[in-house]
Structures are given as structure tokens and as C-alpha cells.
């Protein structure tokens, strides 16, 4: 039996530092997401009383920001250290996680296309759940307001969905000043007004439905998003393809570097 030493095998500095630079962006983005999330929780007093996390209603957008931050920070750290230290274990972790995320994204996209009714029902439940908690969380409130203003919509299927919120409910048991109203983000903007009128939605739903469209958006946000997607399908597809290509590029760099390291290690065993 003869053993040969591959004396020409070496780790490419080009791939090594390109992968390091690639992951620095991941790591820094993770730091930013974590910083923003922790700052937002600090502003709401969650950090000083962690039991508030379990008492939150609806979906707290900050949780999503923190989750993305943790994943990006962890991947960036593993990729940076793995590339600099030529650590196959960390590089395999980075590569494997990116591959997993890539296929999860692909699966979600395919399932969302095949089961559109199910997705629509889940989004309705999500929106209605957060309508109920509209006044409980400032971040959630800003998210819904931004969604309604950007899409010129109101509620999940229409303004009447705001009956789900205790403050906007039209029942006789409610003594809220916002009773039978909608949030200001449902209001049709007046170009003549330079200052946002946050009370423009008060008592709107007391009027006849035929007059609602004079002052508020009557289209539901689910319908608005369903109309928005076909009009912007090329933008959505472009973003998805760009993210996928970045992930594939990262996988390629990691696998190439792993192969170089393994070749060098194999060359030392003779």
C-alpha cells in the first residue's frame, strides 16, 4: 500500500476572506436586529419585568425582530469564526443551517401557493387577533396602522372587524370615546390637512354604510393584499430570487472552503 502527500493542496485565501466578509454582514445585521428589539422591549418595560412577555396579547412584532436577530447573529458568528479558524464544524453548521433555511423558504412558498385558502384563513385569524390587542401594544398598533395606510384598507375584511376591539365596539356596554369608530389609519387622507387628525375615525360607523367610503377605507386588508400581489409579482419574485442567490452563494463559499480544508488535512496524512 502506497500513501501520497498532496503537497500542492492549500486553503484559498480568496474564498476564506470572501466568506468572512459575507458573514460579517450577517453578524452586523444580527447585532442591529438584536439592538433594535432589545431597545423596543426596554421602552415598553419588558426588560425590567420579564413576566410581561407572557402577558402580551396578539403577536408582538419585537419577538419576530429578536428571532431574526438571534439567527443572523449566530450564523454570522459561526461563519466568521469558522472561516478565520478554518473550523470545519462551524462551517458545516453555517452551511447546513443556510441549506435548511433555503428549503424551508421554498417549502413555505410552494405550500402558500397550493393552499391559498388556508393561508387566507390564517392571515384573517392573525389580523383579527391583533385587532383585539390593538391598544395593548404600541408596536402592534404601529404595525396595523402602517399596513392599513399603505394598502388603503380597514380591518381584515372591512371596517366592521373593528367591533372585535373593546374600544371600538359598537355595543351598548361600551363607554369608550372610540365606540363605533375606527383607527385614524382607516381614514381617507385629506390633502388639505398638514397635521394628521387622529380622531377622524370617531363615530364613523354610526353613519349609514353607504356613506362610509366618504371618510374611511371600506376595503378589507386581505382583499387589498390579494390585489397588491399580482400587481407586484415581479418585485416579489425578484426579492425571493435575490435572497435565494445570496444563500446559494454562501453555501458555495462554505462548501468550497470546507473542501480546501479537508484536502489540506488529507495531505498531511501519509
UniProtKB/Swiss-Prot annotation:
**What is the role of the protein in this entry?**
Part of TspanC8 subgroup, composed of 6 members that interact with the transmembrane metalloprotease ADAM10. This interaction is required for ADAM10 exit from the endoplasmic reticulum and for enzymatic maturation and trafficking to the cell surface as well as substrate specificity. Different TspanC8/ADAM10 complexes have distinct substrates. Negatively regulates ADAM10-mediated cleavage of GP6. Promotes ADAM10-mediated cleavage of CDH5.
Describe its partners and assembly state.
Interacts with ADAM10; the interaction promotes ADAM10 maturation and cell surface expression.
Q: How does it sit in the membrane?
A: Multi-pass membrane protein
Q: Which UniProt keywords apply?
A: Cell membrane, Disulfide bond, Glycoprotein, Membrane, Transmembrane, Transmembrane helix
The record, for InterPro entries, names: Tetraspanin/Peripherin, Tetraspanin_animals, Tetraspanin_CS, Tetraspanin_EC2_sf
Which Gene Ontology terms cover its molecular function?
enzyme binding
Q: Which GO terms describe its cellular component?
A: cell surface; endoplasmic reticulum lumen; plasma membrane; specific granule membrane; tertiary granule membrane; tetraspanin-enriched microdomain
User: What stretches pass through the bilayer?
Assistant: 18-38, 62-82, 93-113, 233-253
User: Where are glycans found on this sequence?
Assistant: 169
Which GO terms of type biological process are on file? Answer: positive regulation of Notch signaling pathway; protein localization to plasma membrane; protein maturation
Q: What is this protein called?
A: Tetraspanin-14
Cytoplasmic side, ranges: 1-17, 83-92, 254-270
Q: Which residues lie on this side of the membrane: Extracellular?
A: 39-61, 114-232
Q: Which CDD domains match?
A: TM4SF9_like_LEL
Q: Which organism is it from?
A: Homo sapiens
Give the family this protein belongs to, as stated in its UniProt record. Answer: Belongs to the tetraspanin (TM4SF) family.
Region annotation Necessary and sufficient for interaction with ADAM10: residue ranges? 114-232
The top of its lineage is: Eukaryota, Metazoa, Chordata, Craniata, Vertebrata
PANTHER family reported in the protein's UniProt record: TETRASPANIN (PTHR19282), TETRASPANIN-14 (PTHR19282:SF261)
Q: Which Pfam families match?
A: Tetraspanin
- Return the Gene3D superfamilies for the record: Tetraspanin (1.10.1450.10)
Tell me where in or outside the cell this protein is found.
Answer: Cell membrane
